[in-house]
Amino acid sequence: MAAQNEQRPERIKTTPYLEGDVLSSDSGPLLSVFALQEIMQKVRQVQADYMTATREVDFTVPDVQKILDDIKALAAEQVSKIVKMPSISFRHIVMQARDRVLRVDTYYEEMSQVGDVITEDEPEKFYSTIIKKVRFIRGKGSFILHDIPTRDHRGMEVAEPEVLGVEFKNVLPVLTAEHRAMIQNALDGSIIENGNVATRDVDVFIGACSEPVYRIYNRLQGYIEAVQLQELRNSIGWLERLGQRKRITYSQEVLTEFRRQDTIWVLALQLPVNPQVVWDVPRSSIANLIMNIATCLPTGEYIAPNPRISSITLTQRITTTGPFAILTGSTPTAQQLNDVRKIYLALMFPGQIILDLKIDPGERMDPAVRMVAGVVGHLLFTAGGRFTNLTQNMARQLDIALNDYLLYMYNTRVQVNYGPTGEPLDFQIGRNQYDCNVFRADFGSGAGYNGWATIDVEYREPAPYVHAQRYIRYCGIDSRELINPTTYGIGMTYHCYNEMLRMLVAAGKDSEAAYFRSMLPFHMVRFARINQIINEDLHSVFSLPDDMFNALLPDLIAGAHQNADPVVLDVSWISLWFAFNRSFEPTHRNEMLEVAPLIESVYASELSVMKVDMRHLSLMQRRFPDVLIQARPSHFWKAVLNDSPEAVKAVMNLSHSHNFINIRDMMRWVMLPSLQPSLKLVLEEEAWAAANDFEDLMLTDQVYMHRDMLPEPRLDDVERFRQEGFYYTNMLEAPPEIDRVVQYTYEIARLQANMGQFRAALRRIMDDDDWVRFGGVLRTVRVKFVDARPPDDVLQGLPFSYDTNEKGGLAYATIKYATETTIFYLIYNVEFSNTPDSLVLINPTYTMTKVFINKRIVERVRVRQILAVLNRRFVAYKGKMRIMDITQSLKMGTKLAAPTV
């Protein structure tokens, strides 16, 4: 028992470092977290310098983990809802007539309450209102009918009245028995028919639905009935390819269920993701880099090599004076270990993250540190050929440091023949006169660094993500090889390492050459791990596209700035030695690895929805210039962002790039054709198709000013008046005669206002019983039902606002056309006790605003026409059928450990 209770000693870490004056041995922050902090700090520093003389910007570091959780939550959101009955599309208002009622299309009634009032000087509010109305259409029609209530009538299955989409129960109490029997017979005839859709049994019935809502429902039903079997097979097949590349086994447990005959399934998202959708976003390269790190980078430890390597090569003598021997026993500080992390980040993201040396004028650099860094830097980094880990400045500084080390003859003197140029490494050294010029950095050929005479970028079998087909091969190592750290690397080598050993031997640095010869297996394991991480774990839709990757190095050399500029991180000289003496060993794979494809699909789908919204909004100014006089493209950009999910906005703005996006970036993105197919995108496009008719959004430009007297009929026969179902509305059944309409543009109104004749001119037109149409501006329309005299603001309201004021002896006038317009319906109710002149006033009441909308919002119908709107075909799934959203099956998987970890 004592042995069992004995506590195990803690495993000693192999990477001790000094944190202040305390020797720490923890592994420090996760590399992914550290990367996000360092990249954001660098980006914020550059942006802050840029914005010093302009407006302030919030540069707080975003919580990437929270953003990823929010995007996963978006995948769980249901685009459609499952209901037992459709919403009520038509309701009826009871009148005093026994055989007449008012039928109201509830869609237009509800739509009139969506959004804010449109004005000419707030284009952003106009765009936001349009988006809200479009989303209202999409939400209203995105329903799936399941287990509808039915009843049995003479052996036939009949739909319950509430399923039909018509509300008429409030009418039944005032109807005669004959009319009630007629309606009951019609209801008994609403028989449920048995249908078959995609080998599944369904109920089919005829109901009522408004046209825009039914368009969305019909599109959703067509999406489901198309089965999407091929899309599902493509997604699963692609996941299998991705799993093979990333060593992930994707579960098909859920997929065995949907094949059952009692299951209806919906696939709301598709794989693979179209990478163009993600990379077309303006100024997104840094945000995509951060997402790649957050979703794919594994966690690991920094492993030191066997200490006997240095003890038997560098420090075997009692007195050691060489630079390598001096640094052998040193311990890094916390800041220096952070620089080591930066170095490994640059190695894992070649070209995207590059390194430069810290500029610290107050630091007195030990020459030994510089010399050692110059040697190991040539063995750690790649500078040219196909990509680079370094800036041109750092490569030159490393060349100078290597030059100094070779000329530092602390053991024996070696012959040196200098060249004519005076460039670093322009000499021949040793008995065999080794030409050191070959180690001078050449970004064209990669000479002097790891890319020298090595195929470090390869294209072989097709990769799952079509935009990133490259395979990185540091030191010529194939990432498909399995790594056994105890034996891997023995007998392996590559050109730059061989030449370094030859040059060290020629320079008389035999101990150092022996050290590097012994370090070679450790060095090869290091880069074999990095190759595996890059080619397996980091392969993602957020990986830099091949064309951008291939352009990074030429652009860096030429000083050209493109869409994907590299992130430059600063490191210290001594950190190169500590990085060479430590290898990043992955211990756990990223928790988001198997969920990453679903996160990518959700993100791309939301971006596609935003792009479709912006395309349609960008056309608004050309279609309705009068309401968007002061509009700019940035207005609809902001409106779309404000109505987009917070998680998607946060990803797009990870590097605070929204503060720097210009109109050129935005319009270029909007016009690019790439989209990610999804159910949400399909419904959004259909909603915009329905919204192309602005009257379906309860917006109209057919608003007229006309003086009309409110009817005041005599009640000579109360019973007959009741039977007529008398009502009045300012809604026109047809536009007025064209020759009686005066078109008032802004220019005409301003001219008459400047002359002080605006009101007089309108009065003259009204006295002639003519009509005035104020421009072609869109107006927000509200619907109101009243059974008494409407308020004065409704009756006397004008389709414009005209304000005058005097300032400094000058008269100013303000004219606005975009005002809220109210369509009112006045229903006359009378009693038998009313006298013939009960509705008559001494002075007449006038209405001044008339509206024409080519939609049947309200109409007076006879009782036998109550169910005449049942003309839409609905498909309902039976109650015993299951409706499954199998989108979540695209993320069910298990990460496989690497065979040698």
UniProtKB/Swiss-Prot annotation:
A GO term from the CC aspect: virion component
Entry keywords, A to Z: Virion
Record keyword Transferase present: no
Gene Ontology MF term list: structural molecule activity
Disulfide bonds: none
Residues in coiled coil: none
Main location: virion
Function: The VP3 protein is one of the five proteins (with VP1, VP4, VP6 and VP7) which form the inner capsid of the virus.
Record family assignment: Belongs to the orbivirus VP3 family.
Protein name, entry field: Core protein VP3
Organism: Bluetongue virus 1 (isolate Australia) (BTV 1)
GN (gene name): Segment-3
